[in-house]
Swiss-Prot record:
GO terms for molecular function: phosphatase binding; protein phosphatase inhibitor activity. It comes from Danio rerio (Zebrafish). This is Protein phosphatase 1 regulatory subunit 35. It is found in: Cytoplasm, Cytoskeleton, Microtubule organizing center, Centrosome; Cytoplasm, Cytoskeleton, Microtubule organizing center, Centrosome, Centriole. Residues 58-99, 180-235 are annotated as: Disordered. GO terms for biological process: notochord morphogenesis; positive regulation of centriole elongation; positive regulation of cilium assembly. Its main location: cytoplasm. During centriole duplication, may play a role in the centriole elongation by promoting the recruitment of the microtubule-binding elongation machinery, leading to the centriole to centrosome conversion. In addition may play a role in the primary cilia assembly.
Length: 251
């Protein structure tokens, strides 16, 4: 209806109030989402605006050190009903399980054992490394070095030394002594008509009469006396027989 061209404005009736809301004790004043039954409000009261935060909540999960005692998980609150899926996705992306038990693994030890089994054993290298790290070997080397360095003054450090101040005659005599003995000459130096040297090696070069051995046969009839030789008579016409044969051969 319009009165004199102006609309008639009626006041809206006051809504029924719930006594339980007034008497009940609210857990949190910020979570009071109670609204009136009708959207209309009296003109003298300001309208209440209710806003909701719809931004997604980003939560980062940091891995915590695992203990032997299992940690108790808290039940999810009502406000975190939309965050559980984000947590599960973040765990899958990280690839880490923070609240689950993990078995002891021996894969690294197995790989090391397989690598050692594939390698060939070098005995010489092992002995060399053992000698380098051996205390007994070091002590033995130190003792030998001490014996070579620590010597009394009365003892000669060097042996079989040769003097450098020698005369010419001493050097010649020493050289003749050190010179190996040569084989004696086959021909005499006093022989004027010396024969030419043979083409082959001389067999008598190493001949020694003292080392010469003679062998005699041992026959079974050695003890039997042998007959004495006697001249055989020849006829007289054979006296110059050989001389005649020579004459014939020469002619």
């Amino acid at each position: 209806m319009e009165v004199c061209g102006e609309p008639l404005i009626r006041a809206a009736p006051e809504p029924l109030r719930d006594e339980r809301i007034q008497t009940a004790e609210l857990l949190c004043a910020d979570l009071d989402l109670s609204v009136s039954l009708t959207p209309e409000r009296p003109a003298d009261r300001r309208r209440r605006q209710v806003r909701f935060n719809v931004d997604p909540v980003l939560i980062t999960v940091n891995p915590e050190p695992r203990n032997n005692q299992p940690t108790a998980r808290k039940p999810p609150n009502k406000d975190e009903h939309g965050v559980e899926t984000d947590r599960e996705q973040s765990r899958e992306c990280d690839g880490q399980q923070t609240h689950e038990a993990e078995l002891n693994t021996t894969l690294a030890l197995r790989a090391e054992l397989e690598e050692e089994a594939e390698q060939t054993f070098d005995a010489e290298k092992a002995v060399r490394e053992k000698l380098q790290s051996s205390t007994l070997t070091k002590n033995h080397v130190n003792s030998k070095a001490a014996e070579g360095l620590n010597f009394p003054r009365s003892q000669q450090l060097y042996r079989a030394l040769v003097s450098v101040s020698l005369s010419r005659d001493q050097l010649i005599s020493q050289a003749l002594q050190d010179r190996p003995a040569l084989a004696p000459p086959t021909a005499s130096q006093n022989n004027k008509f010396s024969s030419p040297p043979p083409e082959g090696p001389d067999i008598l070069q190493f001949y020694s009469p003292d080392k010469m051995l003679r062998e005699t046969p041992l026959l079974p009839g050695d003890h039997i006396p042998l007959p004495r030789p006697r001249p055989v008579p020849r006829p007289a016409h054979t006296t110059f027989h050989l001389h005649r044969l020579h004459k014939l051969w020469e002619s």
